[in-house]
Regions:
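Protein-protein interaction/assembly regions in multi-subunit complexes
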Residues: 1-195, 200-239, 260-262, 266-285, ...
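Extended C-terminal regions of large enzymes
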Residues: 59, 79-87, 158-192, 198-682
Length: 682
C-alpha cells in the first residue's frame, strides 16, 4: 500500500471490504482521490474506475461506497451526512447510479475510527456484519441477527459491541431484496433505496467506533470565530428566518415558517415540561425554534406528546422530534417512543383518504406513529412518500380490485382504511417487506415497475399532480410549487429526487419578496432571479444562474458532508445585515457516469423528463397568472436552453461538452466518453 498521507480534514486512508473473500484491506486516500473532495465525488470516482456501466443492482460486481466528507467529525456545524453510492434498483427504465445521504453519527464515527471511506464489494455466502474499531476491523457472523427488525438488530449489535458505536442495519425488506428498502442508522436515520444491495451481499449492518483525533488547519480561536458566525446566521429548520406568528421582536412573520417555537408553547411530555420563553433568538435556544411534532401533527396534539428534539452529530438545531404517545402504544402494540421528522413523521395518514389532510385528528396521529415505526423496523422505503401516494391512488380509483387476484384481494382488510384503523399499515408493510402477493411484491418495486406490471400507463401518474410523480421512478422534491422554472429543471437533472434544498430554503425563508429580490441582487446579480411563489414570470438568465449556483452548492454539500436542510446560509434572521447571509460558509456533478450507464448522449430527450401535470391548473388559469404554479412548456424548454449554455453543456442534447469536463478537472473521462460517442459533436 502507498504511504498514508494525512491531511487536514482527511485521515489519509480508507477500507476495502471484499465480502466474497472476507478480506479487508487499507487503501490510501491520496493520490487516487486528490481531486475528489469526498462524499459523492469519491463514490462516483470509484464507480467510474471499477464498476462497468451496465452492472445491475444485485450483481456481485455492484459496489457500495460509504463516504463522509472532510468536514465530518470536525465539529463543523451540520456536517454529519454520509453519502452512500451504489447502483439503485428503483430507477426506471433501467437501474442507474445514485446516492443516499444518511444522517446520525456514522460520518463522525468513521473519521474517528481513522477512515475517509469504505468500499464494499463482492457477496458473502452467509450473513455478516462489518465491525470497525480503529485498526481492529473484521467481518463477524450475523446469523443470529439476520431476520430481525432494525430496532432489535441495532440493540443486539450494541450489546455485542458498544452502546457508543455508530450502528447501521437493514431490516427484513432488504433481506428479501425489496428495491424499496433502506439502511437504518442511529435508530431512525435512513438511507433510502440502498437496502436491497446490502441484503444481496448478506451484509446485515456496519458497526463503527474509534477514538482517533480529527485535525483541522484553523487556529482554535479562528475556528471558534467561524463557528460563532455560522451560528449567528442560523434560522430554524430549512433556514426559515422569521417566526410563524406575529412577534414584536421580529419585523416579519410567515404562517408557513418552520420557526414555530413561540412564547408559551409547552413541550408537555418533557420531565419537567418545557415552557418556551419570549426570545428564541439566542444561540443557546436554536433547538427550541423548531418542533417537528407540532408542525406535522398539528399544534395541540404535537405539543401534547413532545418530549424533546434530537438529531445529527454537530447540529445545533435538532430537527427530529422525540415523542411519547402512550395512547397509540396501548391501542396498536407499538413502542410509546417515536423519533422522526418531516414526511416520516406524518405520512402514515396519507394511506387513509378520510384523514390524509386532517393532521389534527387523533386517528391521523395514530397512523403516523404506527406507520413510521412499522416501516422503519421492517426497513421499507417510502421514496419521499411515493409509495403511499401510489397505494392511495390505486385504492381510490378502484384499481386494486381490477388487478389483484380475487383471493388476494379478499384477504386484505380494506374496511380498516374506511375506519381509519392504523393497524392496516402493519398488515400492508408486512406484505411489502416479505413480498407477499401481487400487491406486496409490486409496491416494493417502485412506481413505474409496478405500473408496467399491472398494465397501467406511466402517463396516468405523470399527468396527475396528486401523485407528485415526476419520472425515472422518483417523485418531485420541491419543484414548481416552490421555485417555478428553477424547481422544474432541478428535478429533471438527477437520477432520483434531487434532495436539494438550496431552492426552497431561499424561496420559503419567510422573507417578503422585496427582501428576497434584494438578496438575489447581492448573490446572483439580479432581483429577477426569484419570483414570488404562485406569481411566476417567464424564465430568464438570472433564474438559471441561481440554479447553476444551487446545483454547485448541492454537489459541494454532498462532497463535504453538509446537511442541505440547513445549508447554504444565503439568508439570515439578522435585520441589521438586511437578512443577507454568507454563501461562503460551506460542484462537481455526476453527469458523465450516468451517460455511460445509459450509453446515451441525448440526455435532454431521454433523461431530463418532466411530468405533464406541471402544465395543468385546476381552475385552468394560464401560466404566469398570479395564484397558479402552472408552467408553460416552451418556457421550460427555454429554461433548459439557458441553463445548459451557462454551464457549457450542449443545449441540444443536454450533455457536457469536452470543454465542460476540462473546466472542472475531469479530463480523465474525456477519452472514454469520446470512444463511446458520448461527447456531443464528436
Amino acid at each position: 500500500m502507498d504511504t498514508i498521507q494525512k491531511r487536514y480534514g482527511y485521515t489519509g486512508q480508507g477500507l476495502r471490504v471484499n465480502l466474497t473473500t472476507g478480506k479487508i484491506t487499507k487503501e490510501p486516500t491520496f493520490p487516487r482521490f486528490k481531486d475528489e473532495i469526498g462524499g459523492t465525488a469519491l463514490g462516483y470516482r470509484v464507480f467510474w474506475d471499477e464498476v462497468p456501466p451496465k452492472t445491475q443492482p444485485l450483481d456481485e460486481a455492484n459496489k457500495i461506497v460509504i463516504a463522509p466528507g472532510p468536514f465530518s467529525g470536525s465539529g463543523a456545524l451540520c456536517s454529519s451526512r454520509t453519502s452512500i453510492t451504489t447502483i439503485y434498483p428503483t430507477i426506471y427504465p433501467m437501474p442507474m447510479i445514485a446516492s443516499a445521504h444518511i444522517g446520525g453519527d456514522m460520518a463522525a464515527r468513521l473519521k474517528q475510527a481513522g477512515y475517509d471511506f469504505i468500499i464494499i464489494e463482492g457477496k458473502s455466502e452467509k450473513p455478516v456484519y462489518l465491525y470497525i474499531n480503529n485498526d481492529n476491523f473484521e467481518l463477524r457472523d450475523a446469523k443470529g441477527i439476520w431476520g430481525q427488525g432494525t430496532r432489535r438488530a441495532q440493540q443486539m449489535l450494541a450489546d455485542q459491541t458498544s452502546p457508543m458505536a455508530s450502528i447501521a442495519v437493514i431490516g427484513p425488506a432488504s433481506e428479501n431484496l425489496v428495491p424499496m428498502s433502506v439502511l437504518i442508522s442511529a435508530r431512525q436515520h435512513s438511507g433510502g433505496g440502498i437496502g436491497s444491495i446490502f441484503g444481496s451481499k448478506k451484509l446485515k449492518g456496519v458497526v463503527i467506533q474509534g477514538d482517533q483525533p480529527i485535525h483541522i488547519h484553523a487556529d482554535k480561536k479562528e475556528w471558534q470565530k467561524i463557528t460563532e458566525r455560522n451560528i449567528d446566521l442560523f434560522g430554524s429548520l430549512n433556514q426559515h428566518v422569521v417566526p410563524s406568528a406575529p412577534n414584536p421582536l421580529f419585523e416579519f412573520w410567515a404562517p408557513g415558517s418552520r420557526w414555530n417555537g413561540m412564547p408559551g408553547n409547552v413541550w408537555q411530555k418533557a420531565n419537567p415540561p418545557i415552557i418556551l420563553g419570549e426570545d428564541m433568538r439566542s444561540p443557546n435556544k436554536i433547538s427550541y425554534r423548531w418542533c417537528a411534532s407540532q408542525f406535522f401533527l398539528g399544534k395541540p396534539q404535537g405539543l401534547k406528546i413532545q418530549v424533546r428534539n434530537n438529531g445529527c452529530y454537530s447540529c445545533p438545531l435538532r430537527c427530529y422530534s422525540i415523542v411519547e404517545d402512550e395512547e397509540a402504544a396501548a391501542r396498536y402494540h407499538i413502542n410509546k417512543m417515536t423519533e422522526q421528522t418531516c414526511m416520516s413523521l406524518y405520512f402514515g395518514r396519507v394511506i387513509f383518504p378520510k384523514i390524509a389532510a386532517k393532521r389534527d385528528l387523533p386517528a391521523a396521529r395514530h397512523a403516523s406513529m404506527v406507520g413510521i415505526q412499522t416501516m422503519d423496523d421492517l426497513g421499507v422505503w417510502c421514496n419521499y412518500g411515493q409509495l403511499h401516494r401510489d397505494f392511495k391512488k390505486m385504492y381510490v380509483k378502484g384499481l386494486w380490485k381490477k388487478v389483484l387476484p380475487e383471493k388476494e384481494y379478499n384477504s386484505i382488510p380494506w374496511q380498516k382504511i374506511e375506519d381509519c384503523d392504523a393497524s392496516f399499515l402493519q398488515d400492508l408493510f408486512q406484505r411489502i417487506a416479505y413480498r407477499q402477493g401481487e400487491m406486496g411484491k409490486w409496491l416494493g418495486e417502485s412506481t413505474p415497475y409496478m405500473l408496467g406490471h399491472f398494465g397501467i400507463q406511466e402517463s396516468d401518474w405523470s399527468n396527475d399532480g396528486s401523485t407528485n410523480y415526476w419520472g425515472l421512478g422518483h417523485p418531485k422534491h420541491h419543484a414548481n410549487e416552490d421555485d417555478g422554472q428553477v424547481g422544474v429543471v432541478l428535478n429533471c437533472l438527477y437520477n432520483r429526487d434531487p434532495m436539494c434544498h438550496g431552492t426552497v430554503n431561499f424561496t420559503r425563508s419567510g422573507l417578503p419578496i422585496s427582501v428576497k429580490k434584494q438578496i438575489a441582487e447581492h448573490f446572483w446579480g439580479s432581483g429577477d432571479a426569484v419570483d414570488e411563489i404562485g406569481d411566476y414570470k417567464p424564465t430568464n438568465e438570472a433564474k438559471m444562474r441561481r440554479l447553476r449556483w444551487i446545483i454547485c452548492r448541492k454537489e459541494l454539500h454532498d462532497m463535504l458532508g453538509l446537511c442541505s436542510w440547513m445549508a447554504p446560509w444565503v439568508v439570515s434572521p439578522n435585520k441589521s445585515e438586511n437578512y443577507i447571509g454568507d454563501d461562503d460558509m460551506e460542484g462537481k456533478v455526476y453527469r458523465a457516469y450516468t451517460m455511460r450507464e445509459m450509453n446515451e448522449v441525448n440526455m435532454r430527450k431521454n433523461h431530463d423528463f418532466y411530468p405533464g401535470w406541471i402544465f395543468k391548473d385546476a381552475k385552468d388559469r394560464p401560466a404566469f397568472t398570479k395564484g397558479t404554479i402552472r408552467m408553460d412548456k416552451d418556457d421550460i424548454e427555454k429554461s433548459f436552453d439557458i441553463f445548459f449554455k451557462l454551464i457549457n453543456w450542449d443545449p441540444a442534447t443536454g450533455a457536457p461538452t469536452e470543454q465542460a469536463y476540462k473546466d472542472i478537472n475531469l479530463e480523465f473521462v474525456i477519452p472514454v466518453m469520446q470512444k463511446e460517442g458520448l461527447i456531443p459533436g464528436k
